[in-house]
């Protein structure tokens, strides 16, 4: 029973303390009365139920059900899942320093982080992990969650990893001393052309802002005059990271966003004018996977007329969560406020309390309605607002880009879709990488590796591989999808052998969104233009109107 009582106490202290510290004394208290039926019920079950019951397990199941009656983003995270849920945003975690995939119930090391613990111990990309701390680790017990549990651990602790190396059947054992492994938010930064710097950001974590400054300094050394920030498929993260980023590009006293909730008075976030890149022409890329903090940044740039937004309509998450930890290290993320862009719009898409079904299907619904392929399919149901120079923007459903670029469907046949959805493309790419690693290790640059792969007839090799695994060969569809298949296969092998930066550089070469970005910069159109004033009616025109 101590854990049950702890829940009541901790909710009162932690949530109450947070609100008293951050929201001007508006304190949230847990209602503690004789009608606290949930607490009484748990006591009754523990004291009188016919069989012994794990009360902690009941609580783990009850809390998500309670939160499910709220908005779709108020969630419970169990203690065993908490570390994985926060590692990406923390900036680092303690582990061995490998990227891996699980194939045929075995861990395959995909990449070894440079200068990380695993590399220092002697592990190589391509190694198959078959034992951890002297115990076999193969078969059905091998899952992502279990692998993380065994390989992660406190800094400076040791773990023995048994591997089978390519070309050998002998198990070699390496002792790895765990260390801090950085988790990067900025996954690519390079020059698209002689004038245009490009930065891809995958989320907004503790280190996103300093990582971006390092990337900008690198691009400055290369003489960039334009900047493209790619937030496509960026699911968000910490609000403060987005605010700090936006501040770098805005003049003084510009509103970045404000937050407001039932128990939290309005809080404005203003720029201080100390950023170093306030005048550089800029484009921000978004799509339906851009959410939360990514939308905060894009909305601040759009509403302040600071950058041109290119891509497709963003996800539409305009709610702010506070993370609260329980004594057992489980978490809840509770929605405490909404955020509003500088024009006053909340871009949260509609939802129904306690019913997340339609909400979770929203992106599929957009796809089926043709929104990914035609700007005319975007239906604005929220109110209209105006940017600083008078451009119309809309609330209630994500950020609509200034320039729409449809999803590229060239080569998207039923054969390609099945190959992709079945996982066969990823499986083939990894198998090819593993089988040809000695040769592929000779290529250290993306272009060199891409040129080599172009000569290997990978599409034909894939068709044979897929046919043996149940995807029937369809030559006409394969020909129609040849270029797309070749590009995707190349990109996955490049990712396996090099890194995410190399993968990004490769796919951007043939990306219509990147082409549109460069067109905007070449036309000196990155700074939004003030809308033309409506033409004044002539006397003749006014007479015609009256006759109607």
Report each predicted region and the residues it spans.
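Hydrophobic membrane-insertion alpha-helices, especially the h-region
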Residues: 2-20
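Cleft-lining beta-strand/loop regions that shape enzyme active-site pockets
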Residues: 15-34, 38, 42, 46, ...
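Extended, small/polar residue-biased N-terminal targeting/export presequences
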Residues: 49-110, 156-188, 508-518, 524-536
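Structural motif
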Residues: 126-128
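Short, surface-exposed secondary-structure boundary micro-motifs
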Residues: 134-135, 398
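Polar, glycine-rich mid-to-C-terminal structural blocks
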Residues: 293, 305, 312, 316-383
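Conserved functional hotspot residues or short segments at active or partner-binding sites
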Residues: 346-347, 351-548
């Amino acid at each position: 029973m101590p854990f049950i009582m702890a829940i009541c106490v901790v909710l009162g202290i932690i949530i109450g303390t947070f609100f008293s510290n951050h929201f001007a004394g508006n304190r949230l208290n847990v209602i503690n009365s004789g009608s606290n039926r949930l607490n009484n019920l748990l006591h009754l079950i523990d004291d009188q139920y016919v069989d012994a019951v794990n009360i902690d397990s009941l609580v783990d199941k009850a809390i998500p059900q309670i939160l499910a009656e709220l908005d779709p983003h108020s969630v419970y995270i169990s203690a065993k899942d908490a570390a994985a849920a926060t590692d990406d945003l923390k900036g680092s975690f303690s582990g061995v320093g490998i990227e891996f995939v699980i194939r045929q119930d075995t861990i395959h090391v995909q990449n070894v982080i440079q200068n990380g613990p695993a590399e220092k111990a002697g592990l190589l990309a391509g190694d198959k992990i078959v034992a951890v701390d002297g115990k076999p680790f193969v078969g059905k017990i091998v899952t992502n969650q279990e692998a993380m549990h065994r390989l992660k651990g406190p800094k400076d602790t040791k773990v023995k990893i048994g591997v089978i190396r390519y070309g050998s059947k002998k198990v070699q054992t390496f002792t790895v001393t765990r260390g801090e492994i950085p988790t990067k938010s900025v996954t690519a930064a390079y020059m698209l052309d002689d004038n245009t710097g490009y930065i891809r950001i995958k989320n907004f974590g503790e280190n996103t802002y300093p990582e971006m400054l390092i990337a900008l300094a690198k691009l400055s050394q290369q003489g960039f005059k334009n900047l493209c920030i790619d937030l496509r498929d960026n699911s968000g993260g910490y609000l403060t990271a987005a605010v700090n980023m936006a501040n770098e590009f805005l003049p003084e006293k510009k509103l970045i966003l404000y937050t407001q909730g039932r128990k939290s008075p309005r809080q404005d976030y203003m720029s201080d004018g100390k950023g170093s890149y306030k005048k550089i022409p800029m484009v921000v890329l978004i799509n339906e996977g851009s959410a939360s903090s990514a939308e905060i940044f894009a909305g601040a740039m759009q509403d302040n007329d600071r950058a041109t937004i290119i891509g497709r309509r963003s996800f539409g998450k305009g709610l702010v969560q506070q993370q609260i930890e329980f004594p057992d290290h489980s978490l809840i993320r509770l929605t405490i406020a909404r955020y509003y862009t500088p024009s006053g719009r909340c871009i949260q898409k509609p939802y129904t309390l306690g019913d997340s079904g339609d909400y979770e299907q929203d992106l599929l619904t957009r796809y089926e309605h043709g929104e990914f392929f035609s700007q005319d399919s975007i239906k604005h149901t929220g109110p209209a607002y105006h940017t600083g120079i008078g451009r119309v923007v809309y609330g209630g459903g994500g950020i609509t880009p200034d320039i729409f670029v449809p999803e590229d469907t060239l080569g998207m046949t039923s054969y390609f879709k099945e190959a992709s959805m079945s996982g066969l493309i990823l499986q083939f790419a990894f198998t090819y990488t593993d089988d040809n690693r000695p040769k592929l290790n000779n290529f250290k640059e993306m272009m060199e590796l891409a040129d080599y792969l172009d000569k290997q007839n990978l599409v034909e090799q894939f068709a044979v591989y897929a046919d043996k695994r149940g995807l029937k060969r369809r030559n006409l569809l394969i020909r129609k999808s040849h270029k797309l298949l070749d590009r995707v296969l190349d990109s996955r092998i490049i990712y396996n052998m090099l890194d995410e930066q190399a993968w990004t550089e490769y796919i951007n070469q043939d990306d219509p969104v990147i082409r549109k970005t460069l067109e905007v910069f070449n036309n000196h159109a990155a700074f939004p233009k003030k809308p033309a004033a409506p033409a004044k009616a002539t006397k003749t025109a006014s007479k015609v109107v009256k006759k109607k």
